[in-house]
């Protein structure tokens, strides 16, 4: 049989000593916690302000909660909703759902009732684990959907008495529950129940994150234990992040695949220590890095921009950091250089989607390129195609990025049509269509151009907002920038820059446009500039360009 073709231009830049593919254990994700609890029982697994939980303690609480879920009727293959801020309870709940042989449905805590309704109804979840401040959003769905019980967490249950850093909403005391369909987390644990023998295997579904709904209603991405395990292992091995000596700062939300995989699941696979931030706060991040000697931090560019622009930054000792990585958008060159000047560290960029349960591409540590997605990681074959003809494109031509690999989802939950549309066959392989435009260079490194549907058409010229944003960040007085389209009577569409100035800046829109004319082709130059105090961001810290674009079109 002729072997299936795979692009190999990037192999000369592969991380030294690592294989091109991984063989995952034939176990579920829960086995990672079990093994770390055996190997490092008294090692600290989680730190939440002043509270520490060992691997032995973490496994014990996971088993207790799993036993309670099974008593509530949770069975193999059931979907269980998980909606909380970053907290020890999120980690415990995630693994408890898996230990009960069920499927985790992680949900953005910012969603309101009508938004939650779709996820609950579509997934068919009957049980949810949430937190008391989110009850007003989720509890109305009891009785209106299949949802019949909510286990309610109180973050302050996991605080010690020495938690001066904890924000007031985390310190809020436990509130009484006046509905017999609600169970306090502490009561569920106190029942002392043990789970039955595990039945789920590596091919069972483990996690079903919902897409952000940028092209219609959110869709559940079905991922098996094997796929989630593969990427947890990949994260641990790729850049030497798999040492049990690592201290990992968790700043990304756990409901999102990057925080879930690259921070939580990779740390537990490795037996590392996870420092939990409930929400992003640049001063808290500085204090936690200083206090706990954090070695590994995965963030996104907006967090890093905010962190490095902090006037109090000099008060913190961040020299313990050994690895800083992230994705979600290209890191502006000026910010990457500032990080390098301050720490000697190069920001390691990567790429992935909900459909790939986080990483599919990453920069090799010894060959980092800036504003670059990196190379396909272990076992991944990635190509660039013409989105209309599906013809594979050569190096340096822009097209749609497609991905084949062990971490690619099985498909969308209960949506065969969208699943068919999401995949394409090439050389006998099934590739996922990312919807992202980009190209690969002569060395096999991939670069992001923009979302397929975000392009601005200015008098027939194609303008990619992400490219213009990267150039705008070179200006010393721009803190943040988002490029959108605005209507133009002559050009049809033209380029608009929505800008957040750095503190103390007096730059005008006209001077900014004059500067831009010296930096880029005339058709890319913003013809309209508006200044705002802040850009709208999602719970994961990404700039919500669609919100700005829709508001512009409504004018």
Can you annotate each of these PLM segments?
Residues 47-55, 61, 66-114, 121, ...:
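Conserved AMP-binding/adenylate-forming
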Residues 175-210, 217, 241-247:
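Conserved pre-ATP/AMP-binding loop-to-beta segment of ANL
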Residues 291-299, 308-369, 381:
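Gly/Ser/Thr-rich phosphate-binding loop
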Residues 71-72, 99-187, 503-505:
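Structural core segment of the AMP-binding/adenylate-forming
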Residues 375-379, 391-423, 463:
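Conserved ATP/PPi-binding loop(s) of AMP-dependent carboxylate-activating enzymes
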Residues 111, 128-130, 297, 405, ...:
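AMP-binding/adenylate-forming catalytic core of the ANL superfamily
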Residues 54-56, 206-230:
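Conserved AMP-binding A3 loop
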């Amino acid at each position: 049989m002729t072997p299936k073709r795979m692009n190999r231009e990037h192999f000369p830049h592969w991380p030294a000593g690592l294989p091109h593919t991984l063989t995952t254990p034939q176990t579920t994700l829960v086995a990672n916690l079990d093994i770390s609890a055996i190997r490092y029982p008294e090692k600290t697994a989680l730190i939440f302000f002043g509270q520490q939980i060992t691997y032995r303690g973490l496994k014990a609480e996971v088993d207790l909660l799993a036993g309670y879920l099974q008593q509530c009727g949770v069975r193999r293959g059931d979907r269980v909703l998980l909606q909380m801020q970053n907290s020890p309870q999120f980690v415990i709940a995630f693994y408890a759902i898996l230990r009960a042989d069920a499927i985790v449905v992680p949900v953005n805590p910012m969603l309101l009732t009508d938004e939650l309704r779709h996820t609950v109804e579509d997934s068919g979840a009957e049980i949810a684990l949430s937190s008391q401040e989110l009850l007003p959003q989720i509890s109305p769905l009891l009785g209106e959907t299949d949802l019949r019980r909510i286990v309610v967490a109180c973050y302050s249950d996991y605080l010690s008495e020495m938690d001066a850093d904890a924000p007031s909403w985390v310190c809020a005391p436990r509130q009484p529950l006046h509905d017999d369909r609600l169970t306090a987390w502490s009561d569920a644990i106190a029942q002392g129940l043990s789970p039955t023998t595990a039945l789920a295997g590596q091919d069972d579904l483990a996690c079903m994150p919902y897409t952000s709904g940028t092209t219609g209603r959110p869709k559940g991405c079905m991922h098996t234990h094997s796929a989630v395990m593969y990427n947890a292992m990949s994260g641990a091995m790729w850049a030497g992040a798999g040492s049990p000596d690592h201290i990992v700062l968790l700043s990304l939300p756990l409901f999102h695949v990057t925080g879930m995989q690259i921070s939580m699941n990779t740390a537990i696979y490795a037996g590392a220590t996870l420092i939990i931030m409930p929400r992003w706060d640049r001063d808290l991040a500085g204090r936690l890095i200083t206090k706990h000697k954090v070695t590994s931090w995965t963030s996104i560019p907006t967090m890093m921009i905010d962190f490095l622009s902090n006037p109090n930054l000099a008060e913190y000792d961040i020299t313990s950091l050994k690895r800083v990585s992230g994705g979600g958008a290209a890191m502006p060159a000026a910010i990457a250089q500032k990080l390098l000047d301050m720490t000697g560290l190069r920001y390691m960029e990567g790429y992935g989607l909900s459909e790939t349960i986080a990483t599919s591409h990453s920069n090799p540590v010894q060959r980092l390129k800036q504003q670059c997605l990196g190379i396909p990681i272990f076992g991944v074959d990635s190509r660039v195609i013409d989105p209309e003809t599906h013809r594979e494109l050569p190096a340096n031509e822009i097209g749609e990025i497609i991905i084949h690999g062990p971490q690619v989802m099985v498909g969308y939950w209960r949506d065969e049509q969208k699943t068919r549309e999401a995949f394409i066959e090439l050389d006998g392989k099934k590739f996922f269509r990312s919807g992202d435009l980009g190209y690969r260079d002569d060395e096999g490194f991939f670069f992001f151009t923009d979302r397929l549907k975000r392009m601005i058409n200015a008098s027939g010229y194609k303008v990619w907002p992400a490219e213009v944003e990267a150039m705008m960040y070179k200006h010393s007085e721009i803190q943040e920038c988002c490029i959108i389209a605005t209507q133009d009577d002559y050009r049809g569409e033209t380029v608009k820059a929505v800008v957040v100035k750095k503190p103390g800046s007096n730059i005008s829109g006209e001077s900014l446009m004059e500067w831009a004319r010296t930096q880029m082709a005339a058709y890319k130059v913003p013809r309209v500039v508006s200044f705002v105090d802040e850009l709208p961001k999602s719970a994961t810290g990404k700039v919500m360009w669609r919100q700005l674009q829709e508001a512009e079109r409504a004018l």
